[in-house]
Every structure is written in C-alpha cells, then in structure tokens.
Curated annotation (Swiss-Prot):
Pathway per the UniProt entry: Amino-acid biosynthesis; L-arginine biosynthesis; N(2)-acetyl-L-ornithine from L-glutamate: step 3/4
The protein, known as: N-acetyl-gamma-glutamyl-phosphate reductase
Role summary: Catalyzes the NADPH-dependent reduction of N-acetyl-5-glutamyl phosphate to yield N-acetyl-L-glutamate 5-semialdehyde.
The species this protein was found in: Janthinobacterium sp. (strain Marseille)
Lineage of the organism: Bacteria, Pseudomonadati, Pseudomonadota, Betaproteobacteria, Burkholderiales
GO cellular component: cytoplasm
Reaction(s) the record says it catalyses: N-acetyl-L-glutamate 5-semialdehyde + phosphate + NADP(+) = N-acetyl-L-glutamyl 5-phosphate + NADPH + H(+)
Length: 345
C-alpha cells in the first residue's frame, strides 16, 4: 500500500483528496496536517468521511511526513517549495496542488504570486501534472506541479487544434466560468452567500495568474506565436467549470475532420469525453467526477471554431488530477480510485 500524507487537509481540495483517497484500493492514509485543527478527528470536521477516515489532524511538525511514500500539498502557494527539499531527500514523492512547481519561468512566478521561489533548482525536474499531455514525464517524476483548474480546460480544449496547426495561435480567446469553491474555503466577502448567490461577474480581466501558466504550456505545442485573451468569471454554483474557447481556422478543414482531430487525440483517454459535434456539455455532467467533456461548434460554418469544455473544478481541475498523477508515479492503473460516476441531479 502507498503511504500518503496530506499537508493542508481542511480546505476544499484537501477534503476532496481525502474523499478520493479514502476508497483508493492501493492507498493508506497516514498523515493529515492542520496546525489550527491539531488533534481534531477528521470526521468531526467532515462528517461525510465518518467510517472512512479515522485519522485526526496533526500539526505539521508532529506529522511523520518523511515516513510517507508521497505527500500532497493542498496548501497556499509557497508552502510546498519550503518543505519539498527535505521530503525529496528522504525519498518521498511530492505532488503540489498550488503553483509552486507549475511554472518554469521563475520571473513570471514571482511576478504573479508575489513571493520569491525558494528552490528554483527543483523546477528543472518538476513535471507538469496535466496527464493527457505530459504522461511520460509524470511517470518518471519525483515532484509534480498540479495544473490550475482554468489552465486544464484551456490546454485540453486547444491542444489538438494547435498540434495540427489549423488555427491562428496568436489570437486565442478563453471565456471561462467557475463555481465559488474555486476560490477556496477561506472567509472572504466576495464568496459570502449574500455576495456570490444570485450574482455573476468577471474578475481578473486585466490579467490573471493562470494566463502565464497556460501560455507557457501552449507554446510547447506549436512553433507559432501564441497569444491568449483569457477572462474568468465567478458564477453562483458550488462546483463546476465551463470554458468557451474561440480560435480562427487558418486551414481548409471540414467539421468531420475537426471532430476527428479531437477523437484521435483523446479517444483512448479514460477521463476525456469528446461529445458529438454540436453538443452542449453541462457542468453537472461532471460533478464529483474526474471527467472532462469537450464539444466542438462552428458558427455559420465560418472560420471560427468554438470549443466547449466542462469539468468539476475540484476533481479534474484539482484533486482528481493529482490522484491521477500519483497513480502514474507509482505504476498503478491510471484510473485507480477515480472511476466515480458524476452525481445527478
């Protein structure tokens, strides 16, 4: 059994990791840290885990993380890079759900996250954890930077088009919506029920920290210049993400051939569903699952292709993707512990 530790087990991605790993056939939950909740049984904070998780939260200095096989960091940015060197030296693998190991460009990281990077030497070996586009590197990795939720949808939605060279890569548009859980569990006025309920707004229009991450990865898929206009929105739901991606076609290609690009790219992917051309995927069709659904449109048969992408921001957009990476890193079936059917209604 793989001995797993979780640093930061009280946030939404932390409890989602607990939910997924509690029933994973190859995992033994060993340590869950929270300085504030030290000594509190996990099931007392999260009754949904009663009978499934019998651990108590422990302060980080008390947790025997170096005795684990892998440690997940479901923490604010900056925590993983402070602890990763010691864990790696002890032979422990690291999966960070924050941004510490996503960006190879240190200057971009420090600009957008407003903190210095304390172990830039580890960035060279850190694997970017978007499995469908980086599977081989993840298999061999000691440390993985889990992708952001928005970048996951943008990259998977645009990759087949960029790799085929059929769109103008310099003018990509991403219009993305996320549920409120994407903002985390911290107390914040903008996510209070009376503020977020019955409301819909854009944010980060002049610049968002997921833009440099997405651009860095998209540029690896094409030799062309890549430009991205990305606007995120907050919508009044708990879970779910819907990204509408626009690109101008530069090649004479029919709709069947466009569809074939995506079916060829993702036809064998267990967690990507390429829906029939012209479909309208709904966020609820992925709720509480590791599935991501994609559908293509071509308005008026013109030169614009529209890609619709939906996922659960806490699962494929965060914790589920991290578990998918863990499975690869330990030579397990990639789908282990992740074959949950989406919850409806």
């Amino acid at each position: 059994m793989i001995k797993v530790g979780i640093v930061g087990g009280t946030g939404y991605t932390g409890v989602e990791l607990l939910r997924l790993l509690a029933t994973h056939p190859e995992v033994k939950l060993t340590a869950i840290t929270s300085r504030k909740e030290d000594g509190l049984p996990v099931a007392d904070m999260f009754p949904s885990l009663r009978g499934r998780v019998d651990l108590a939260f422990s302060a980080p200095e008390k947790a025997k993380l170096t005795e684990c096989d892998v440690v997940f960091f479901a923490t604010p940015h900056g925590v993983a890079m402070a602890q990763a060197p010691e864990l790696l030296a002890a032979g422990v693998k690291v999966i960070d759900l924050a941004a510490d190991f996503r960006l190879q460009d240190i200057a971009a990281f420090e600009k957008w996250y407003k903190i210095p990077h304390s172990c830039p030497e580890l960035l060279k070996e850190a694997a970017y954890g978007l499995v469908e586009l980086n599977r081989d590197a993840i298999r061999k990795a000691r440390i993985v930077g889990n992708p952001g939720c928005y970048p996951t949808t943008m990259q998977l939605g645009l990759a087949p088009l960029l790799q085929a060279g059929v769109i103008d890569a310099s003018h990509l548009i991403a219009d993305c919506k996320s549920g409120v859980s994407g903002a985390g569990r911290k107390a914040e006025v903008a996510t209070l029920f009376s503020e977020a309920g019955d409301n819909f707004k854009a944010y980060g229009v002049s610049g968002h920290r997921h833009s440099p991450e997405t651009l860095e990865r998209l540029r690896l898929l094409t030799k062309d210049k890549v430009g991205l206009l990305f606007t995120p929105h907050l919508v009044p739901m708990i879970r779910g993400m819907h990204s509408t991606l626009y690109a101008r076609l530069t090649k004479d290609i029919d709709n069947a051939a466009l569809q074939a690009l995506f079916e060829k790219a993702y036809g064998n992917e267990p967690f990507i569903d390429v829906m029939p051309f012209g479909s309208h995927p709904e966020t609820r069709s992925t709720r509480a699952s590791n599935m991501l659904r994609i559908a293509l449109h071509r308005p008026d048969d013109g030169d614009t292709v529209v890609v619709l992408v939906v996922q659960d921001n806490l699962v494929k957009g965060a914790s589920g993707q991290a578990v998918q990476c863990m499975n690869l890193m330990f030579g397990l079936d990639e789908t282990a512990g992740l074959m949950h059917i989406p919850v409806l209604p």
